[in-house]
Amino acid sequence: MQHKLLFSAIALALSYSAQAVIVPEGTQLDEKQHIVINNGAEPQSFDPQKTEGVPESAVAYQLLEGLVTSDSEGKLQPGVAESWENTPDFKTWTFHLRKDAKWSNGDPVTAHDFVFAWRRLVDPATAAPYASYLSYLQVENAQDIIDGKKKPAELGVEAKDDYTFVVHATNPVPYAVSLTTHQSLLPLPQKVVEKLGDAWVKKENYVGNGAYNWQTTLLTKKSNL
């Protein structure tokens, strides 16, 4: 089965990732499937924490899956997290991850990958455009880490075990779950990023957990009007 993602300024061929997608029982998929996304510019990067434009987010949501997703009507749906709950004061949110969620290299997607990604987001060394997003989410120590007053390891997130991700907020955030759909909060394959650094985002190194795998990239030479 083959999936393709096409752009007006860039053509990106993606293959179907069976590990990441849950297909409803009885659904018959075509042998070849295509998604066409009309972007106005070439994506700068496929690192979800180092980009901020629409072209990049359009790709990121195909290559990576977050804690929750939204359907065509904007309603929240389980992503890597199959369920979640909060304390009565809306300051602590616990996400229970699917044990069958896999990275495209076969490794399991764990709570540690989310902890790593969120810490990396607020780390000043990352220079992430949306670093302040975790401050908006009221995550403990987020702003102090961004300002260089505390270490990324002090961010208010934890992996209670491989499949339980916990977020601690300084103030009540009743809408926290909906905020986790943002591209900057997508997980990253910790082992791969730690080993390769910024080179992890190259096509030959890219590891995702979304519905598609990155295969080829082709810059267009002309426009068809």
Named regions from a protein language model:
Residues 31-41, 82, 92-95, 114-117, ...:
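Short, well-ordered beta-strand elements
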Residues 38-88, 205-209:
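N-terminal lobe/hinge region of extracytoplasmic solute-binding protein
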Residues 172-225:
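Gly/Pro-rich hinge or "lid" segments in bacterial periplasmic/extracellular proteins
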Residues 83-130, 166:
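Aromatic- and charge-enriched surface segment that lines or borders ligand/interaction sites
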Residues 1-19:
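Gram-negative bacterial Sec-dependent N-terminal signal peptides
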Residues 113-115, 122, 126-191:
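Surface-exposed binding/hinge segments that line
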Residues 24-36, 107, 208:
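Immediate post-signal peptide segment of exported/extracytoplasmic ligand-binding proteins
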Residues 22, 41-57, 80, 107, ...:
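A structural "hinge/loop" feature
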